[in-house]
C-alpha cells in the first residue's frame, strides 16, 4: 500500500479508528483539497474507486461547490466535526451526501482534513473492502484472536491462534495502540503491524506485508487429475510431426494477454470533466471518458486541442478552437470521438468556462462533456482501430478467391495505406504448410523462426500470404473505400513511382513481397534475426523510396520517417527528431500572432516553416496499429490566388499616409489618454496624453499587462470590464464606462473615467482614459457643503429644542397666572382696564407658545426626527373633526364652510394627528383670508388611478405665483396680506406667524403625500393634497 504515511498509522488515530471499525467512508485530504493522503475502502468506493491504492497520493477532483464548503470549514481552525451536504456521483447521476469534516493532526504533526460519512453497509467485510493484494494482507481480529473479516489471501499465511493472542496483548499494552514487528506465518516470519481500533468491544486491525508461501499458492491453484489421466493424455497427444507447431501454439497460449477494452454500445450517457491550459493543452480529464471510448482514445493529457482535433478528425471548421481563444463561457458544442478498437465514433457534447487566477491571469478552461455511446456511428477513417494497438480479436477477413498477383503500381500504393510491414497473420487464415519451427518461449508468434523446406511449399505459402493480405486489406478498410481526396493523392504518388522506375527496383529487391506475379524457387534460408534488431529493408523499402515525406507514429511516439522527410526538414536521423521534441516540434498550428491556422505547417530543423497538405491513414505496423501521415508540400500554384486589388498610384498612397499621420496627430492632441490593448490584455501602444498621464514612455509600457496602469483595488474591476467586452454579452452593448483609480509610474494615484471599445479587425481593444481629478474635487466640495448644511440644520434643531424647553416653562406660568387673575378668585380687580390687560397677556402668551411649537415641529420635520405613528386613517372623519373645530371661527367671520365627501372613501396610511393639523391649518388660512360672505369648500375624491385627493377651495383674495412661492417659505408673509391687514385694521395679534403653509407642506410630505397650491389674485386659492395608491388601503 503506497502513500507518505503508513496506512495503519492513520487508521489508529483517535479521530479515525472508531469510524474505521464501524465501516464509515473516510478520506484524509491535504489542505489544498486535492491531494488524498489516506482513504479506506468505503471512502474509495464513495468517490468511484474500487481499490484504496487507486486513490491514495492521487488527485481528487471535487466539485467547485464542495470545495468551497469544505474550504470554509477548514478556515475555522476547530477540531469539532461540521456537517456539509454535497452532491457526489459520476455521469448523469448524483446523490446528496452528508459529509462530516473535521481538522486532524497526522502522526508527524501536519494538519489535514478528515472527510467522513456513514455507509449503509457497516459490516466488518465492508470496513476492509478495497484493501489487500498478493503482497498485502488485512484482517480484523476480535478480543480473543478470532478473525472477524480478512482479505482473500490472508488465510494462506497460516498464522497460529497463539500468535494472534500475543499480538492482541501487546497492542493493548502499547501507549499509541500500535505494535509493529515481524510476525510468524507458517515456517517463516514477515513484517506486520496491529492496531487496537476499539475497546468495547475490542477490535484490532492487522496488516501483514509479504507473499504467501509458495506451497499454499500452488495448492490453491492446482486442479486434481482423474484416475485415467495417462490414458486420456495418450488419446489427445498429437502426432510427432505436429509437435513443434503445437508446442509453439502452446507457448503462445501461455503468454499472458493484456486486458483489452470492450466498447459497450448500450451503456447510458456518461459525464466527464476536462481542463485545458491557456495554450489549449489538455491538463486533466476524468476517467469517465476512458470508460466509454477506451484508455488510448482518452489519453490526451499533455496534448493541445488543435493536435487532437487534427488526429481525430473533428472540429474541422475550427469553431471550438476559436471559442478557446475567446476566453468566454460556451456550451453545446458537439463532436464525434473515435472509439478504441472499433470502427465507430461516439457523439460528445462539450461545455466550458474560463478560469482566472487572483491576479486575473487567464489559466485556461474547465469544462465538462457528455458522451453518448448509444448514438455511435461508423467512422470512415477507422481511427479507433489504430488506437487499439492491434487487430481486434473479433475481426474476421472475408472469404474471397485469391486474385492474380499484380505489378507494383497504383493499387500497391493504395494497399500501402493499410498494410505496411505487416507480418502478424492469424494462423487460422493460412493453410498448414510443412514448417520447421524453432521454439522460443516468451516471444511473439510473428517472431518465430520459420524455414521453408522446399520451393513447392514456399510457393504455396506465398500464394496464401497474397490471399491473406488481400482479404485483410478489404477487412480493415471501410466499406466505402478511400475518400476521393485520399485516392487522388495516392494515385499521384503511384504516378511518380512509375516515372522514377521504383516499381522495377521493388520487384528486384532481396525479399520479394507477397504480391509479385511469380515467386522463384529459393534454397532454404537460415533463421531470420529477431525483431530486437533493426528493421529489415524489405519492410520499409517502398516507404524509404517514396518521393513524399512519410511519418509512422502512434500518438507522440514516432516509429519511422523516410528519407524524404529528413531531406525536407533538415534533420539527420529519426533520433534527432525524437531528441528535438518528436511530433510537436515538426508541426506548428499557431501563427506568429497567436491565431490558430486552418492548414498544417511543417517546421524545419532551422526553424523555418513550410505549408503542407496532410493525409492520415490507419495502418498495421509491427503487429499492431499505427497512423501513417503522408505530407505533400503546398506550392504557390496550389495556394488560392489572392484577390486582385487595384494598384494604388503614388498620389493615393501619399494621401493615405497623410491621412494616417493626421489621425495619429489627432490622437496625440486629444487630452484624453488612449491605450490600444491586444487580445491577451497587453498594451500595444498609447498616445502622448496617456504617456503623460501615467508617466511611462511609450516603449516602456508596450508589451506590459494593461492592469499595471491601475491601483490594486481597481485592477480587478478594469480587467472584468475588459473580459466582459470580449464576449457578446450585455457589456458589449451597454458600454457605460467605469470609474477607476490609475497608478502613475512614480506611485501616485489618479482618479480616472475609463471607456473601452472593441477593435473590429485585430480582436483587440481601445481604452480611453479621462482624468477626473477636478470632478472629484468639485464632488468633494459639494459633499462637504452638504455635510456643513446638515450640521447647521442639526444645530438649529437642537437650538430650537433648547429654546422651546426654556421658554415653555415661564410662558406657561404667565398664561396660567393671567387666567387666574382674570377669574378674580381671590377678589375683584376693581378696574375694567386691568381686565383687558390680563386678556391681552393671556392671548399673547398663547400666541408665543403656538409659535414655539410650530418652530419645533418644522425643525423636527426638516431633520426627520418628528415622531409619527402611521396607521389606517379615515380622511373624511379627520376633516370632519377639523371643520367642527373651525365652525365657530367661520361663523364669527361670516364665512360659510361647505363639505363634499365621497362615500366609501378608502382609508389611508398616515399619522392621524398630523392629518388633523394639516386640515386645521388649511381651514384656518382659508377662513382668515376670505372676506365676509365668502365660502370655503372642502372635498375628498377617489380617483381612477387609485389616488385619494383632498381639496380645500376658498373665494378669498388669492395670490400670484411669486406670492405663492414667498408664502411657502418659513417666516415670510406676502405683501397682499400686509395690505389686507392695513385695510381691515385688524389687531396684529390675529395675524399669522408665516409658518402656516410651510409647516403644512412639511407635514404632508412627511406622510408620503403630495402638496400643490393653485391661486390667482381676486379669484381665491385651491390647495390639493394627493395620497398615492401605495398609501391607500383599497379593498
Curated annotation (Swiss-Prot):
InterPro entries assigned: HATPase_C_sf (IPR036890), His_kinase_dom (IPR005467), HisK_dim/P_dom (IPR003661), HisK_dim/P_sf (IPR036097), PAS (IPR000014), PAS-like_dom_sf (IPR035965), PAS_fold (IPR013767), PdhS_histid_kinase (IPR048231)
Segments for region (Disordered): 500-533
PROSITE patterns (UniProt xref): HIS_KIN, PAS
Domain of life: Bacteria
Region called Important for polar localization, residue ranges: 1-613
Region (Interaction with DivK): 614-1035
Keywords of this entry: ATP-binding, Cell cycle, Cell division, Cytoplasm, Kinase, Nucleotide-binding, Phosphoprotein, Transferase
Domain PAS: 659-730
UniProt domain Histidine kinase: residue ranges: 802-1031
Protein name: Cell-division control histidine kinase PdhS
Organism the protein comes from: Brucella melitensis biotype 1 (strain ATCC 23456 / CCUG 17765 / NCTC 10094 / 16M)
Taxonomic lineage: Bacteria, Pseudomonadati, Pseudomonadota, Alphaproteobacteria, Hyphomicrobiales
Name of encoding gene: pdhS
Amino acid at each position: 500500500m503506497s502513500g507518505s504515511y503508513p496506512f495503519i498509522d492513520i487508521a489508529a488515530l483517535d479521530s479515525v479508528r472508531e469510524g474505521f471499525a464501524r465501516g464509515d467512508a473516510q478520506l484524509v485530504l491535504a489542505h489544498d483539497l486535492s491531494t488524498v493522503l489516506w482513504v479506506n475502502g468505503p471512502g474509495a468506493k464513495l468517490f468511484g474507486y474500487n481499490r484504496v491504492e487507486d486513490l491514495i497520493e492521487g488527485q481528487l477532483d471535487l466539485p467547485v461547490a464542495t470545495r468551497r464548503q469544505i474550504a470554509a470549514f477548514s478556515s475555522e481552525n476547530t477540531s469539532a466535526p461540521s456537517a456539509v451536504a454535497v452532491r457526489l456521483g459520476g455521469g448523469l447521476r448524483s446523490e446528496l451526501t452528508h459529509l462530516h469534516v473535521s481538522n486532524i493532526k497526522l502522526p508527524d504533526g501536519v494538519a489535514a482534513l478528515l472527510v467522513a460519512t456513514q455507509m449503509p453497509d457497516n459490516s466488518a467485510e465492508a470496513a476492509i473492502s478495497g484493501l489487500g493484494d498478493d503482497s498485502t494482507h488485512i484482517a480484523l481480529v476480535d478480543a480473543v484472536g478470532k478473525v472477524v473479516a480478512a482479505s482473500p489471501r490472508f488465510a494462506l499465511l497460516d498464522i497460529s491462534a497463539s500468535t494472534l493472542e500475543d499480538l492482541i496483548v501487546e497492542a493493548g499494552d502499547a501507549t499509541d495502540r500500535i505494535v509493529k514487528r515481524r510476525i510468524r506465518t507458517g515456517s517463516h516470519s514477515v513484517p506486520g503491524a496491529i492496531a487496537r481500533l476499539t475497546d468495547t468491544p475490542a477490535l484490532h486491525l492487522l496488516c501483514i506485508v509479504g507473499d504467501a508461501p509458495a506451497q499454499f499458492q500452488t495448492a490453491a491453484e492446482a486442479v486434481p487429475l482423474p484416475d485415467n489421466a495417462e490414458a486420456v493424455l495418450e488419446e489427445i497427444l498429437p502426432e510427432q510431426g505436429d509437435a513443434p507447431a503445437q508446442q509453439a501454439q502452446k507457448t503462445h497460449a501461455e503468454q499472458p494477454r493484456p486486458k483489452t477494452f470492450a466498447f459497450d454500445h448500450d451503456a447510458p450517457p456518461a459525464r466527464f470533466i476536462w481542463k485545458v491550459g491557456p495554450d489549449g493543452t489538455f491538463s486533466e480529464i476524468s476517467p469517465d471518458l476512458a470508460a466509454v471510448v477506451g484508455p488510448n482514445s482518452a489519453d490526451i493529457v499533455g496534448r493541445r486541442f488543435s493536435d487532437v482535433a487534427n488526429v481525430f478528425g473533428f472540429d474541422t471548421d475550427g469553431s471550438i478552437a476559436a471559442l478557446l481563444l475567446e476566453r468566454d463561457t460556451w456550451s453545446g458544442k458537439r463532436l464525434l470521438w473515435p472509439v478504441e478498437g472499433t470502427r465507430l465514433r461516439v457523439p460528445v457534447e462539450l461545455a466550458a468556462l474560463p478560469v482566472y487566477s487572483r491576479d486575473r491571469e487567464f489559466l485556461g478552461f474547465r469544462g465538462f462533456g457528455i458522451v453518448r455511446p448509444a448514438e455511435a456511428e461508423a467512422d470512415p477513417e477507422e481511427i479507433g482501430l489504430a488506437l487499439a494497438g492491434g487487430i481486434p480479436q473479433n475481426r474476421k477477413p472475408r472469404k474471397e478467391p485469391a486474385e492474380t498477383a499484380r505489378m507494383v503500381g497504383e493499387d500497391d500504393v493504395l494497399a500501402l495505406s493499410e498494410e505496411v510491414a505487416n507480418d502478424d497473420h492469424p494462423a487460422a487464415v493460412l493453410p498448414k504448410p510443412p514448417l520447421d519451427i524453432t521454439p522460443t518461449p516468451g516471444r511473439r508468434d510473428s517472431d518465430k523462426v520459420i524455414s521453408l523446406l522446399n520451393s513447392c511449399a514456399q510457393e504455396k505459402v506465398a500464394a496464401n500470404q497474397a490471399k491473406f493480405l488481400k482479404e485483410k486489406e478489404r477487412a480493415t478498410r471501410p466499406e466505402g473505400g478511400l475518400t476521393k481526396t485520399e485516392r487522388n493523392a495516392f494515385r499521384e504518388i503511384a504516378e511518380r513511382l512509375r516515372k522514377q522506375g521504383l516499381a522495377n527496383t521493388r520487384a528486384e529487391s532481396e525479399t520479394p513481397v507477397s504480391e509479385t506475379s511469380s515467386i522463384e524457387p529459393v534454397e532454404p534460408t537460415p533463421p531470420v534475426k529477431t525483431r530486437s534488431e533493426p528493421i529489415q529493408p524489405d519492410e520499409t523499402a517502398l516507404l524509404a523510396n517514396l518521393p513524399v515525406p512519410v511519418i509512422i507514429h502512434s500518438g507522440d511516439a514516432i516509429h519511422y520517417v523516410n528519407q524524404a522527410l529528413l531531406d525536407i526538414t533538415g534533420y539527420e536521423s529519426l533520433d534527432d527528431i525524437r531528441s528535438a521534441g518528436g511530433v510537436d516540434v515538426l508541426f506548428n498550428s499557431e501563427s506568429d500572432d497567436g491565431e490558430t491556422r486552418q492548414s498544417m505547417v511543417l517546421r524545419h530543423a532551422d526553424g523555418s516553416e513550410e505549408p503542407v497538405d496532410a493525409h492520415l491513414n490507419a495502418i498495421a505496423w509491427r503487429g499492431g496499429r499505427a497512423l501513417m501521415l503522408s505530407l505533400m508540400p503546398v506550392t504557390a500554384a496550389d495556394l488560392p490566388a489572392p484577390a486582385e486589388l487595384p494598384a494604388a498610384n503614388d498620389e493615393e498612397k501619399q494621401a493615405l499616409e497623410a491621412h494616417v499621420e493626421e489621425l495619429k496627430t489627432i490622437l496625440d492632441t486629444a487630452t484624453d489618454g488612449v491605450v490600444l490593448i491586444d487580445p491577451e490584455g497587453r498594451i500595444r501602444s498609447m498616445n502622448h496624453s496617456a504617456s503623460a498621464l501615467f508617466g511611462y514612455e511609450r516603449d516602456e509600457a508596450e508589451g506590459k499587462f494593461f492592469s499595471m496602469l491601475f491601483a490594486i483595488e481597481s485592477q480587478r474591476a478594469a480587467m472584468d470590464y475588459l473580459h466582459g467586452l470580449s464576449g457578446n454579452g450585455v457589456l458589449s452593448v451597454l458600454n457605460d464606462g467605469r470609474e477607476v483609480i490609475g497608478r502613475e509610474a512614480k506611485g501616485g494615484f489618479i482618479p480616472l473615467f475609463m471607456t473601452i471599445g472593441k477593435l473590429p479587425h485585430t480582436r483587440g481593444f481601445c481604452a480611453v482614459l479621462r482624468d477626473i481629478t477636478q470632478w472629484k474635487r468639485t464632488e468633494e466640495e459639494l459633499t462637504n457643503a452638504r455635510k456643513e448644511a446638515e450640521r447647521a440644520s442639526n444645530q438649529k434643531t437642537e437650538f430650537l429644542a433648547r429654546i422651546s424647553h426654556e421658554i415653555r416653562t415661564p410662558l406657561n406660568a404667565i398664561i396660567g397666572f393671567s387666567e387666574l387673575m382674570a377669574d378674580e378668585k381671590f377678589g375683584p380687580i376693581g378696574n375694567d382696564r386691568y381686565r383687558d390687560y390680563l386678556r391681552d397677556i393671556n392671548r399673547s402668551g398663547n400666541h408665543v407658545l403656538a409659535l414655539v411649537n410650530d418652530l419645533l415641529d418644522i425643525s423636527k420635520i426638516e431633520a426627520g426626527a418628528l415622531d409619527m405613528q402611521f396607521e389606517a386613517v379615515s380622511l373624511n372623519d379627520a376633516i370632519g373633526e377639523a371643520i367642527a373645530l373651525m365652525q365657530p371661527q367661520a361663523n364669527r367671520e361670516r364665512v360659510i364652510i361647505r363639505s363634499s365627501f365621497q362615500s366609501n372613501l378608502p382609508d389611508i396610511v398616515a399619522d392621524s394627528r398630523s392629518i388633523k393639523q394639516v386640515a386645521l391649518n388649511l381651514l384656518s388660512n382659508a377662513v382668515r383670508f376670505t372676506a365676509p360672505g365668502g365660502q370655503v369648500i372642502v372635498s375628498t375624491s377617489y380617483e381612477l388611478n387609485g389616488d385619494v385627493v383632498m381639496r380645500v377651495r376658498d373665494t378669498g383674495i388669492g395670490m400670484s405665483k411669486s406670492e405663492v412661492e414667498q408664502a411657502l417659505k418659513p417666516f415670510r408673509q406676502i405683501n397682499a396680506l400686509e395690505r389686507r391687514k392695513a385695510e381691515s385694521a385688524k389687531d396684529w395679534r390675529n395675524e399669522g406667524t408665516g409658518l402656516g403653509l410651510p409647516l403644512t407642506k412639511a407635514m404632508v410630505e412627511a406622510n408620503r403625500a403630495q402638496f400643490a397650491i393653485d391661486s390667482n389674485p381676486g379669484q381665491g386659492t385651491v390647495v390639493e393634497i394627493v395620497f398615492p395608491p401605495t398609501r391607500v388601503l383599497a379593498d
